[in-house]
C-alpha cells in the first residue's frame, strides 16, 4: 500500500522548485486562467510558514498590500504554480514567523543574510536538464553493453 502511494505521489511531485526557507522573500509565479487565455501573475512576499512533506507540502507567503497584511497559502506541487524565485534570504531563528502578523513597519523587517548565494530559476532548469541528459546517456550506455 505504501509503495502505491509513493508511486502516485512521484507522478505529481515537481522537481524544479528552488529550495527556499522560512524568512526568505520570494516571488511566486501563479498561472491565472481568464477565459481561454492563460497568464502569469507574480505574488511577492515573505515565507512565514512551511508545512507538510512530500506532495502535501505547502507554504504561506505574507505581504503588505496598500497597508493591509495579506497572506496566501500555496501548495508546492500545485499545477497552478509555474515557478518560485528567491529575492533575498533572511536570518531567522524560528520555524514559524507568525509573530510578524502583529508587527508593523520597520519592526516587521527581517535581517538579511549576507554572503549567501541566491539560486536562480534558470540555473535550476539547466541543472535538471543536464542531470536528465546524463541519466539518459548512462541508460543508453548500459543498454548498449
Swiss-Prot record:
Q: Which UniProt keywords apply?
A: Ribonucleoprotein, Ribosomal protein
For whether the record's keyword set contains Protease, the answer is no
The GO terms this record gives for MF are: structural constituent of ribosome
GO BP terms:
translation
Cell division found in the keyword field? no
Family matches, as InterPro entries: Ribosomal_bL19, Ribosomal_bL19_CS, Ribosomal_bL19_sf, Translation_prot_SH3-like_sf
PROSITE patterns registered for this protein in UniProt: RIBOSOMAL_L19
Membrane spanning residue stretches: none
Q: Which SUPFAM superfamilies match?
A: Translation proteins SH3-like domain
List, alphabetically, the Pfam families matched. Ribosomal_L19
Listed under GO cellular component are: cytosolic large ribosomal subunit
The family line of this record is: Belongs to the bacterial ribosomal protein bL19 family.
Briefly state the protein's biological role.
This protein is located at the 30S-50S ribosomal subunit interface and may play a role in the structure and function of the aminoacyl-tRNA binding site.
Q: What is this protein called?
A: Large ribosomal subunit protein bL19
Amino acid at each position: 500500500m505504501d509503495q502505491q502511494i509513493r508511486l502516485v505521489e512521484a507522478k505529481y511531485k515537481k522537481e524544479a522548485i528552488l529550495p527556499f526557507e522560512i524568512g526568505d522573500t520570494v516571488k511566486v509565479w501563479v498561472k491565472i486562467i481568464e477565459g481561454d487565455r492563460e497568464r502569469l501573475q507574480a505574488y511577492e512576499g515573505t515565507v512565514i510558514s512551511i508545512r507538510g512533506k512530500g506532495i502535501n507540502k505547502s507554504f504561506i507567503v505574507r505581504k503588505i498590500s496598500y497597508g493591509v497584511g495579506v497572506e496566501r497559502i500555496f501548495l508546492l506541487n500545485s499545477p497552478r504554480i509555474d515557478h518560485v524565485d528567491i529575492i533575498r534570504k533572511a536570518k531567522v531563528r524560528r520555524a514559524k514567523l507568525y509573530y510578524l502578523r502583529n508587527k508593523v513597519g520597520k519592526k516587521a523587517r527581517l535581517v538579511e543574510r549576507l554572503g549567501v548565494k541566491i539560486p536562480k530559476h534558470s540555473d535550476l532548469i539547466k541543472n535538471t536538464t543536464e542531470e536528465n541528459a546524463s541519466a539518459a546517456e548512462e541508460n543508453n550506455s548500459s543498454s548498449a553493453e
